[in-house]
Amino acid sequence: MRAFGKTVLLGVTVVTALGISSIAFSQRLGKNLDEINQLANKEKNVRVATSWEPENEAALLKGFTQKYPGIKISTDRISGIDTRERIMNEALAGIVDHDLVNVSGELRNQYIKAGVLAGPIPWRNLFPKINERHFSPDGYFAASGFSTYIIAYNPTLVPKDKVPKSWNDCLDPYWKGKLVVLTRPRTFTGLAPGWGEEKTLAFARALKDNQPVWKSSQTGALTQVAVGEYPMICGMAYHSLKSTVQRDPTAKVAYAVPSDLPFQIGEAMGIMKGAKNPNAALALTGWLVTPEGQKNMDLEGRSSPYVPGTEAAELVKKHNAKIVFESWDALQHEAEMARKITGAWGFPKGKN
């Protein structure tokens, strides 16, 4: 695992479509799984830009390395928008260092429009037994990880009879001026496809009226809850809470699973056009979406709720929760919904 930090100066050079075409077909994708696997074994390498936790990688990828012992996986850890934009800009300049990239939701359409991705790929034909929600309708992405959002709290500060059971419990006057709400409203954009715009914005306004403590850092807010500065966070990513507990099992944090449980595509893998090892990248992605791969994604707290036996599926089952899924199509409207929610909170336009 390496931190991704290469900088490319593009200057004022205009990169044309011909500039990309020279690297676009340096390698070809196999026509079927047998051919893909044969070519993947010949490529022998795959380089991935991902947000996997370094300590989880060996166990996460164990099944793949056993199936493909001749393929070496190298990873670069990326986070946020900047590193992913850099990868896209480098590709436009003809530099393709990664075979497989976890592209964040805000940039997926940009990657497609820029022409830096291989595809469309017939994911659903290649992997007909995998739930179709794992594959984008346009054929450019496969979801290897999902994000779900829960309510985090400090069990020493929250009485048992006040442990929330639904999102509406965040509106209880008991929490007025006490609970934390994150300024990036991923929880509530995730609920919007199931709730509808009217209900989502009405809830956002009611939440604001409960005078929450606004925080921009999810990790920082959870640390403050753990040390007792605040009792609760109304909406945060389950995988972030899990990562905190893995690092410090004594952390005083617990979580409640609301009756409406939002799931979003948290890790969308795209194969880069001009990748040196596109078949190995496709083989790895195909393995990640299998039941075995998704069980291993439990380590990250990002498994699929649509694969029986995963942590995510058991979370839904145990708490009798209703899945609210933000589909690939709904993701296109997420930024607009985020602006409306933060507008209802009284934030300046563009803050989300």
Report each predicted region and the residues it spans.
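Ligand-binding pocket segment of bilobal, Venus flytrap-like solute-binding proteins
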Residues: K178-V257
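Early extracytoplasmic/lumenal segment of secretory-pathway proteins
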Residues: Q27-S104
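A bilobed periplasmic-binding-protein/Venus flytrap-type ligand-binding module shared by bacterial periplasmic
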Residues: A152-L157, A192-W195, I265-N277, N296-M297
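Extracellular/periplasmic bilobal clamshell ligand-binding domains
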Residues: E311-N352
